[in-house]
């Protein structure tokens, strides 16, 4: 049994583990670049951080274990919400990320990589971008503070994925776990079937949602009031700056890391709602979102790395809750690993289905006829 004193101790550990994790992880970038250059094996070391995230962290997750603790709603949550350190840290990561991104662009054009090393460096930086830029933006864009939502938009612009700011809040959170949501994967759907549709539909839907929003405000779509024009404009400006600083290869680097950051995000989206559905009601609408409509994971290390994104059930039930007070729901469907491990598994569809399909079927015993697959109910499953 997890005692209250253990929960309080875990809150203290996590409070300082968020900055400590990144104080350890970010220096690995210059370390791998330096070791590779000195040893003449820079092409292999370029993949170093990618290997750490998806090779070492899953192992450490299983060694360190899970964190089932929740802050007390009466005695702890109010004070946790008021502690500025949590907010300050997320905002400080914005200039840190931009500094790391420009430094990484310099390394890309000066480290004498072969095509293999270039790809490895782009993938490694894109992975960091997926965690810092997109994941932190995800935390920030849900907040009421204009500073935080703008910081989130700026982070998304750094990976050319500004549509997420609009579509995620106004689209995904409204239609999650229904056929109307491109970011909710279907039962038995592979990640490679899911990704192209997610990229295209979410991009189109972001512009459609922004247009509808502006029309309700009585403003023109193609105007200075359209925030997507501003955020994508910043992305274009960043691409130009990378080109001026580092030549055309700088632009290749900027766009490449953007793609792999967005790729990482959508793979995580695939994992978070795989096979889950909201029941259709008699009036044709869907039941309200609850913690039952997202996969939960309590592996401590990955939760620290991702600002408790893995407590996704609580996030969807209460989208404005800050990361430090997100809760674990034992009754939510539980992933067998942390996101880092599940990411690797998702890239191998036969293994993914072997592990996850039985879990979906067990969770929905007696309701398999309600499942959705690529927008259609799966009626041929017993």
Regions found by a protein language model. Name each.
Residues 67-70, 107-110, 141, 275, ...:
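Juxtamembrane transmembrane-helix termini
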Residues 11-62, 84-109, 116-130, 224-269, ...:
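Alpha-helical bilayer-embedded segments of polytopic membrane proteins, i.e.
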Residues 62-79, 277:
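Membrane-helix interface/capping segments
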Residues 2-30, 148, 153, 157-227, ...:
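Cytosolic/stromal cytosol-facing helical appendages immediately following the last transmembrane segment
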Residues 71-86, 208-215, 318:
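Short membrane-interface loop/juxtamembrane segments of multi-pass integral membrane proteins
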Residues 57-68, 131-137, 162-165, 264-273:
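Juxtamembrane membrane-interface segments at transmembrane alpha-helix termini
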Residues 73-196:
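Intramembrane catalytic core of multi-pass membrane enzymes that act on lipidic substrates
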Residues 131-135, 254, 304, 308, ...:
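Short alpha-helical catalytic segment bearing the HExxH-like zincin motif
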